[in-house]
């Protein structure tokens, strides 16, 4: 099993876009969704819960999720690994 270490870099298409409005967290990606290069998974971690969303190259990534103080969001690119989002 390979250990994945999250990366973070502002203005990088691999980093999930996270916008908090009221009690909702809006999650989008600017990443390409092509057969050879796409976001495979989004992980939402809050309190004692891990929620995993799986994607295909045909999918568009844009959804809302209830906000909590302890939330973390990661995106997994099939080529470039794991990336951590920061709430803006």
For each predicted feature, which ranges?
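Surface-exposed loop/edge segments in extracytoplasmic proteins
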Residues: 46-54, 83
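Short edge beta-strand/loop segments characteristic of extracellular beta-sandwich folds
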Residues: 26-32
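Surface-exposed, short loops/turns at beta-strand junctions within beta-sandwich domains
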Residues: 64-71
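Short strand-edge motifs at loop-to-beta-strand transitions and within beta-strands
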Residues: 59-63
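Transition segment at domain starts
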Residues: 1-22
């Amino acid at each position: 099993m390979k250990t994945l270490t999250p990366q973070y870099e502002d203005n990088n298409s691999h980093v999930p876009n996270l916008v908090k409005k009221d009690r909702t967290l809006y999650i989008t990606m600017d990443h390409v969704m092509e057969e050879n290069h796409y976001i495979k998974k989004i992980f939402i971690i809050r309190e004692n819960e891990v929620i995993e969303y799986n994607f295909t190259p045909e999918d568009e990534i844009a959804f809302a999720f209830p906000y909590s103080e302890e939330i973390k969001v990661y995106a997994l690119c099939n080529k470039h690994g794991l990336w951590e989002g920061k709430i803006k």
